[in-house]
Design a protein with these regions (language model features):
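Mixed-charge interfacial surface used for oligomerization/domain docking
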Residues: 39-43, 47-53, 57-64, 70-235
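Structured helix-beta-strand junction loops
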Residues: 2-3, 27, 102-105
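N-terminal glycine-rich phosphate/adenylate-binding segment common to multiple enzyme folds
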Residues: 16-47
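N-terminal glycine-rich anion-binding loop in soluble enzyme alpha/beta folds
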Residues: 1-16
């Protein structure tokens, strides 16, 4: 972007997937892959093609693919949870079943600094992006049914992070008795500010994971974006 080159993303190739997972299946008794949402990415479909070929080459391969219906730290946190279950001696089926439930116990609140990248990526119409920019409207986005969806809106430029945290606290599903957060950002200062605010409110241990948007998600959310994943109460 700094060089004036437009941002774009491309799915990982079949051959890269194949070589990587072939090696993993040879080195491990079982392999579980949590794929990006199939509704928004071709990775899940590519992984299934790779799985079929690997199983033809190696009938003993125990390769499982899970459509996470999510992105980013959702998947990272679920992978950590799966690894702990494996250490505890849980079976592959138990791990997959539990993780499919576990990933739904987090809710995403994503705030972007500019609407430009959402418009470029087709997530927002040009008209909506223009009106939103003119009126200083910032959409709060979330992940529903495997896609980025609008959850709410904030107006103005001041104290946006305070307003975002207030929205989270007003969520009827927010687990206020045991608050846990995952933070991912494309602006370190903003990320640290959110961490400080949450720790002041809920204690040092409330943030379970902190990270930076990778190039794939960063392409679509742009600089200055921040997502807070919140542990919610589920039935």
């Amino acid at each position: 972007e700094c060089l004036g080159i437009g941002n774009q993303s491309i799915s990982c190739s079949f051959y890269i997937f194949h070589d990587y997972f072939k090696q993993q299946c040879e080195e491990h008794e079982s392999v579980i892959y949590f794929a990006l949402s199939s509704a928004a990415s071709g990775q899940y479909q590519t992984a299934n093609l790779v799985k079929s070929e690997i199983e033809e080459e190696n009938p003993n391969a125990d390769f499982h693919i899970v459509d996470s219906q999510k992105f980013s730290l959702y998947i990272a946190q679920t992978a950590v949870h799966a690894a702990q279950m494996a250490k505890d001696g849980k079976s592959v089926d138990e791990i997959i079943t539990e993780c499919e439930k576990y990933i739904k116990t987090w809710r995403c609140y994503l705030l972007v600094d500019t609407l430009k990248y959402l418009e470029k990526g087709g997530r927002l119409s040009k008209a909506a992006a223009f009106v939103g920019t003119m009126l200083d409207i910032k959409p709060i986005l979330t992940i529903e049914h495997g896609l980025v969806e609008s959850l709410d809106k904030l107006r103005g430029k001041k104290k946006l992070l305070d307003k975002l945290i207030a929205k989270i606290q007003d969520d009827s599903d927010f687990d206020a008795e045991n608050p846990k957060f995952l933070i991912v950002q494309s602006n370190e200062d903003k990320g640290q500010e959110v961490c400080e605010k949450l720790r002041d409110e809920y204690g040092e241990d409330c943030i379970e994971m902190y990270g930076e948007f990778g190039p794939l998600i960063g392409t679509h959310v742009g600089r200055g974006a921040i997502a807070i994943l919140v542990k919610i109460v589920t039935e």
